[in-house]
């Protein structure tokens, strides 16, 4: 049993953020605040969500994109972090797995995910 004060604090933290519902296979654009000296800017990271794990304020998600020279880049973001400026859902993917780690071994056409038709 968790402390009720901690639970109420976490619910307040979650209610403040405006984050869309997404799952593994969806294409997301994440705006991350970056502090360089005394300046703050927002850097976008766009890719496929390959996993969502955890619950409550400890929830994290992993985004994978193909960088320069076809090098895969993965970043793990805490969902309710203050450094996240925005999370935008670009495409809803059609997948049958909760964790898409098999995409690490694929490249080219086999690494693509079909879009969910409505």
Curated annotation (Swiss-Prot):
GO BP term, example = translation
| An example Gene Ontology molecular-function term | structural constituent of ribosome
Record-linked SUPFAM superfamilies? Translation proteins SH3-like domain
Q: Which PROSITE patterns match?
A: RIBOSOMAL_L19
Keywords assigned: Ribonucleoprotein, Ribosomal protein
At the top level of its lineage, which domain of life is listed? Bacteria
Its Gene Ontology cellular component terms are: cytosolic large ribosomal subunit
PANTHER family recorded: LARGE RIBOSOMAL SUBUNIT PROTEIN BL19M, RIBOSOMAL PROTEIN L19
Provide the function of this protein.
Answer: This protein is located at the 30S-50S ribosomal subunit interface and may play a role in the structure and function of the aminoacyl-tRNA binding site.
The similarity comment for this entry is: Belongs to the bacterial ribosomal protein bL19 family.
HAMAP family linked: Ribosomal_bL19 (MF_00402)
- Name of the protein in its database record: Large ribosomal subunit protein bL19
Q: Which organism is it from?
A: Wolinella succinogenes (strain ATCC 29543 / DSM 1740 / CCUG 13145 / JCM 31913 / LMG 7466 / NCTC 11488 / FDC 602W) (Vibrio succinogenes)
Name of the coding gene: rplS
């Amino acid at each position: 049993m968790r402390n009720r004060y901690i639970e109420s604090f976490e619910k307040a933290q979650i209610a403040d953020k405006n984050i869309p519902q997404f799952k593994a296979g969806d294409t997301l654009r994440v705006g991350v605040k970056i502090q360089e000296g005394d300046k703050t800017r927002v850097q976008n990271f766009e890719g496929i969500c390959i996993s969502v794990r955890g619950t409550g304020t400890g929830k994290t998600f992993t985004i994978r994109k193909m960088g320069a020279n076809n090098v895969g880049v993965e970043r793990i973001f805490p969902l309710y972090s203050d450094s996240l400026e925005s999370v935008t859902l670009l495409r809803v993917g059609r997948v049958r797995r909760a964790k898409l780690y098999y995409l690490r071994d694929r490249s080219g056409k086999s690494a693509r995910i079909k879009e969910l038709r409505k």
